[in-house]
């Protein structure tokens, strides 16, 4: 469904073809293995990994070539999505990072993630602070806010967030 512009409200056919390649090591802080699904250096039941994709999207017969970056979120087994999950993923030419916060009523805040400056070793985050505002009325401007991250090495990473685009999912 088109959410803005002259075709707003119309339903258009969409096709997507992507070739996906890992561009960094997998990240995991949890332990775990599943039969026929294990590795020596990281938990295979849950991990994230920076990726780059190339391909094309066809919307209503119009083809657009794509080169995009993102984060592979691999979960094997149940994941309790009824908790307050917040993710911040950045993946560019200089670095990749993932910051996660999980809020469970009555429990201390769970925060984790990684920062990987390309050409350097991946660093675990010891603290994540995500201060976000959500705009439910406009999916194209759905979130704004700030973040403050602390790596185990002492490196600090701070920034602000401003939506430049968005869509309903």
How should each PLM-predicted stretch be described?
Residues 1-169:
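Structured soluble/peripheral alpha/beta segments that form catalytic or ligand/cofactor-binding pockets
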């Amino acid at each position: 469904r088109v959410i803005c512009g002259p075709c707003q409200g119309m339903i258009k056919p969409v096709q997507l073809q992507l070739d996906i390649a890992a561009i960094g090591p997998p990240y995991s802080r949890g332990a775990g293995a599943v039969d026929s699904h294990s590795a020596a250096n990281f938990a295979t039941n849950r991990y994230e990994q920076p990726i780059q994709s190339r391909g094309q999207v066809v919307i209503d017969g119009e083809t657009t070539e794509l080169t995009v970056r993102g984060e592979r979120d691999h979960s094997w087994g149940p994941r309790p999505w009824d908790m307050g999950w917040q993710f911040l993923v950045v993946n560019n030419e200089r670095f990749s990072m993932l910051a996660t916060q999980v809020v469970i009523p009555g429990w201390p805040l769970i925060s984790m993630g990684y920062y990987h400056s390309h050409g350097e070793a991946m660093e675990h985050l010891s603290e994540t602070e995500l201060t976000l505002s959500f705009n439910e009325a406009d999916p194209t401007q759905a979130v704004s806010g700030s973040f403050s991250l602390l790596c185990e090495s002492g490196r600090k990473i701070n920034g602000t967030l401003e939506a430049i685009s968005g869509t309903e999912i």
